[in-house]
Amino acid sequence: MDYLSHNVSENLKRIRQSKGMSLDQVAEQTGVSKSMLAQIEKGTANPSLGVLGKITSGLRIEFQ
């Protein structure tokens, strides 16, 4: 896992847990599949900018 993937993975998991949300809830709120979210959190998938946009918009967080 490269540096960027690791950061995205760790941040998504941290934010999801801090909001007390399950992967199912995040999937419903963002429009990104549960399996894709799980792969991102595990670092086995690199999300496109479009997917990152859906996640940040759905979770109401800033993309930096």
Ranges and model annotations:
Residues E10, L49-L52:
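Short alpha-helical elements of helix-turn-helix
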Residues R16, G31-S33, N46:
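Intrinsically disordered, low-complexity segments
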